[in-house]
């Protein structure tokens, strides 16, 4: 074992020790950013970058499960990404489909697809649905795969569902408007039956949410990591957890 590996192991153990008895986020959202820039920095194609990034996911989920995280939401494809050049988008969709299938085949985690699959090619949407259906119905760690996902789009879809439900009950728009509460919208979000994310991590150094879970993250803690997603290490994750543990969550109080 090299000296670097020894030092890395020592540092990882110190980080783990610093989390002993400290709060661990129940739900972690992750914006998997930087695949293309990572690839460009070492002379790889964008497709190669996406494949390496997809390969990181299983490893990351193992880290999350190890520390007791219950839910992970992975943002793999935004609605904005759908406007990319057709050849890159086709390759990216295929990589995502293969990655989700591989996650399902491990039999370790319950998978849920969150996003508007109507925006995707039918073969990709069908593959994603099948992978989710074939994953375990229950697991210690549940994984949300956000594909064709945008926070504004999610809220619009939730409002539409609220209006449809009201119409089916014979309510007028005026009656709906007079009694509408934020909880009515929240329960129609893709993750309406899950707790909101406690911690949102974004890799690549970008310090914005770009629409990720904008309703659910109202009281989330944010951690922005300079590392591109393919290079994201266990110590980077543990640092994010340490930063979370050191913060005082006031929840608006």
Pin down the residues of each PLM region.
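Flexible, compositionally biased loop and terminal segments
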Residues: 1-253
């Amino acid at each position: 074992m090299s000296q670097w590996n020894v030092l890395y192991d020592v540092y990882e153990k110190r980080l783990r020790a610093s989390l002993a008895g400290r709060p661990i986020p129940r739900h972690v959202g992750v914006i998997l950013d930087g695949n293309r820039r990572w690839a460009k920095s070492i002379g790889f194609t964008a497709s190669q970058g996406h494949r390496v990034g997809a390969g990181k996911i299983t490893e990351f989920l193992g880290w999350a499960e190890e520390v007791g995280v219950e839910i992970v939401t992975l943002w793999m494809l935004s609605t904005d990404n759908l406007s990319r050049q057709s050849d890159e988008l086709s390759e990216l969709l295929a990589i995502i489909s293969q990655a989700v299938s591989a996650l399902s085949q491990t039999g370790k985690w319950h998978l849920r697809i969150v996003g508007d699959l109507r925006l995707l090619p039918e073969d990709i949407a069908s593959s994603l649905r099948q992978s989710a259906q074939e994953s375990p119905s229950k697991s210690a760690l549940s994984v949300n795969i956000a594909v064709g996902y945008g926070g504004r789009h999610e809220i619009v879809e939730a409002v539409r569902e609220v209006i449809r439900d009201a119409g089916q009950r014979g309510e007028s728009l005026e009656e709906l408007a007079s009694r509408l509460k934020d909880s009515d919208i929240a329960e129609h979000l893709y993750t309406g039956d899950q707790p909101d994310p406690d911690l949102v991590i974004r890799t690549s150094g970008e310090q914005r949410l770009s629409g990720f879970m904008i309703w659910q993250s109202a009281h989330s803690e944010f951690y922005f990591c300079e590392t591109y997603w393919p290079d994201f290490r266990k110590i980077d994750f543990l640092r994010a957890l340490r930063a979370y543990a050191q913060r005082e969550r006031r929840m608006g109080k």
